[in-house]
Structure formats: structure tokens, C-alpha cells
Amino acid sequence: MRFILSLPVLAVVLAMVLEGPAPAQADPDISSSLESIPGKLKEFGSTVEEKFRTAIDQIKKSEFSEKTQNWFSELFHKVKEKFETTF
């Protein structure tokens, strides 16, 4: 049974070996590489901008930032009241 199953596998491997190596891809020339750089930089910049905006929005919407902002507001009002009552 194993011998019968291994024959098709052997035939496929033999066909792949006899096919030979795949043709090599042509190396891109320098001019085409240099022409693609601005597009890649623009794509990179937009990706970074999108991730940065997402991170900033996430920070703004987080509970920690809201609590911190409230704490600073309360502290400022307390200091302001103390300053007004003292002077």
C-alpha cells in the first residue's frame, strides 16, 4: 500500500527535478529603482501619519487621559482659589 502511494509522489518529484531551475528574474535597473523611491516614501509617510493619528485619538479617548485632565483642572482651581484668598 505504501509503495503504491509513494509512486505518484516520486513521479511528481522527478518531474520537478527534470524541469530544471526556474528562469532568473531580471534585475531592475537603477533608473526604475530611483523612480519608485518618491512613491514609496509617500506611501510610508501616509502610513506613519495614519498610525500616529490613530495612536493620538486612542490616547485622547482613553480613560487615563480623561482622569488626568480632570485631576489637573481640579488642582488648578484649588490653587487659583488659594491664591485669590491669600492675596
Curated annotation (Swiss-Prot):
Gene3D superfamilies, per the entry: Apolipoprotein C-I
Location in or out of the cell: Secreted
Any one GO biological process: triglyceride metabolic process
GO cellular component: high-density lipoprotein particle; very-low-density lipoprotein particle
A Pfam family reported for this protein in Swiss-Prot or TrEMBL: ApoC-I
Position of the signal peptide: 1-26
Source taxon at top rank: Eukaryota
This protein's UniProt keywords: Lipid transport, Secreted, Signal, Transport, VLDL
GO molecular function, one term: fatty acid binding
Similarity field: Belongs to the apolipoprotein C1 family.
PANTHER family: APOLIPOPROTEIN C-I
Main function: Inhibitor of lipoprotein binding to the low density lipoprotein (LDL) receptor, LDL receptor-related protein, and very low density lipoprotein (VLDL) receptor. Associates with high density lipoproteins (HDL) and the triacylglycerol-rich lipoproteins in the plasma and makes up about 10% of the protein of the VLDL and 2% of that of HDL. Appears to interfere directly with fatty acid uptake and is also the major plasma inhibitor of cholesteryl ester transfer protein (CETP). Binds free fatty acids and reduces their intracellular esterification.
Name of the featured protein: Apolipoprotein C-I
Species annotation: Pteropus alecto
